[in-house]
Curated annotation (Swiss-Prot):
Organism for this UniProt entry: Klebsiella pneumoniae (strain 342)
Site (Mediates proton transfer from the protein to the inner aqueous phase): 203
Protein name, entry field: H(+)/Cl(-) exchange transporter ClcA
Keywords: Antiport, Cell inner membrane, Cell membrane, Chloride, Ion transport, Membrane, Transmembrane, Transmembrane helix, Transport
Lipid bilayer topology: Multi-pass membrane protein
């Protein structure tokens, strides 16, 4: 006797039942399994967006450089074209941010910190396209910005998007997926999973609600984003500096001196960032046309600088291995360092969609290498390697400015694959952090968040005062 085949209606009934079961599981906000499943989804999406963002920025840069190469033999064409192309790309980023999502300007990390405390909105339907396309414009223009800040904000917004799509209503899931997305975004930007975890625990420690569910979710998301990154980009170190020699014990005091140097520079750098932000605020006064034109001028100047001194612009990832290899003299290293300090301050403080992690890593490399090369003739018996000071300097400025020494240490070691330098890294970053704190320096991202919240309160107070007048 022939067995009866299930009818179409039976197939549909089973499919609906399965869909309802999955939906009920996910909507149990207190179920750790549901949070972990969503964390895996968030991490996977953050990894995919991170890879797409990196390749999109590289494509824009290659198209811009390729267009300039076509007219490289005609100086009267290449200089105006370099300015115009970079200016137009930058203006796209500035316009999108100012017109559609002001919170997408700058790094975006303070916005995620504010969102974790439920003090700042997360409008993912606006921020995701604006930050992605705007970042393509500003980074593609050659401005001195990094992609890590945008990736943290994109990742956090992906976390909130997933939460809204699956209608998970518990405050715990709301907070956890936002943090998971931020950690996954940093991991996808640098291929540094442990640094992504530490960044949430250390830098966002006042906002992050640490418990077993949240930390497992962060781990899950970071694992998935790292797997996605390595599928597309391979498992090699993101910054190729080669295997450097370990630092002998009798040279470790030099790394403490280097850390103290960064401990002095870190608070000064933060002060300059904030003052430069105030200057730009006075220049454009909130006017969108002035703001976009100003951004176009900055982008165009970066395009011209890229022709004269390519090492002075861009995120700095290409510069780091060249500088760490000792290919520049001490004088040239210091010149590029000063030039990049100026360009970093201008590009980041203007409110362009882009991060400051990568530019700070490049600054730390330049100053660390210069210190090491200056120390080599002073202490010939030590047989010093300037590259080890470059690696130590990379994390030291991050530690002094952002006040996240653990993140700085692990991030640099993961990016360069030089884990044998962990002891000099610890000494340098700890010295930088302690001295920066002693000098009264405040963490950069926390300070920017406080200023943003103060501005938000002032705007709300102004609206509250204006409302009664309109009603009368």
């Amino acid at each position: 006797m022939k067995a009866e085949t299930p009818s179409f209606e039976a197939h549909q009934f089973v499919r609906v039942r399965r869909g309802d079961a999955v939906r009920r599981l996910i909507q149990r906000d207190k179920t750790p399994l549901a949070v972990l499943l969503m964390a895996a989804v968030v991490g996977t999406l953050a990894g995919l967006v991170g890879v797409a963002f990196e390749k999109s920025v590289n494509w824009v840069q290659n198209q811009r450089i390729g267009a300039l190469a076509q007219v490289a033999d005609h100086w009267y064409l290449v200089w105006p074209l370099a300015f115009i192309l970079s200016a137009l790309l930058a203006m796209v980023g500035y316009f999108l941010v100012r017109r559609f999502a002001p919170e997408a300007g700058g790094s975006g990390i303070p916005e995620i910190e504010g969102a974790l405390e439920e003090l700042r909105p997360v409008r993912w339907w606006r921020v995701l396209p604006v930050k992605f396309i705007g970042g393509m414009g500003t980074l593609g223009a050659g401005m001195v910005l990094g992609r890590e800040g945008p990736m943290v904000q994109l990742g956090g917004n992906i976390g909130r998007m997933v939460l809204d799509i699956f209608r998970m209503r518990s405050p715990e899931a709301r907070h956890t997926l936002l943090a998971t997305g931020a950690a996954s975004g940093l991991s996808a930007a640098f291929n540094a999973p442990l640094a992504g975890i530490l960044f949430i625990i250390e830098e966002m420690r006042p906002q992050f609600r640490y418990n077993l569910i949240s930390i497992k979710a962060v781990f899950t998301g970071v694992i998935m984003s790292s797997i996605v990154f390595r599928i597309f980009n391979g498992e090699a170190a993101i910054i190729e500096v080669g295997k450097l020699s370990n630092a002998p014990v009798n040279t470790l005091w030099l790394y403490l001196v280097l850390g103290m140097l960064f401990g002095c520079f870190g608070p000064l750098f933060n002060f300059l960032v904030l003052r430069t932000q105030d200057i730009f605020q006075r220049i454009h006064g909130g006017n969108i046309k002035t703001w976009v034109l100003m951004g176009g001028v900055i982008g165009g100047i970066c395009g011209l600088l890229g022709l004269m001194q390519p090492s002075a612009v861009g995120g700095g990832f290409n510069l780091i291995p060249i500088a760490a290899a000792g290919n520049f003299s001490v004088g040239l290293l210091l010149f590029i360092f000063i030039a990049r300090v100026v360009t970093t301050l201008i590009c980041f403080s203007s409110g362009a969609p882009g991060g400051i992690f990568a530019p700070m890593l490049a600054l730390g490399t330049l100053l660390g290498t210069a210190f090491g090369m200056a120390a080599i003739p002073l202490f010939p018996a030590y047989h010093l390697d300037a590259g080890t000071f470059a690696i130590a300097g990379m994390g030291a400025l991050l530690a002094a400015s952002v006040r996240a020494p653990l993140t700085g240490i692990v991030l640099v070691l993961e990016m360069t694959d030089n884990y044998q330098l962990i002891l000099p890294m610890i000494i340098t970053c700890l010295g930088a952090t302690l001295l920066a704190q002693f000098l009264g320096g405040k963490p950069l991202y926390s300070t920017i968040l406080q200023r943003t919240l103060a501005k938000q309160e002032a705007e709300q107070a102004a609206k509250a005062q204006q409302a009664p007048r309109e009603n009368t």
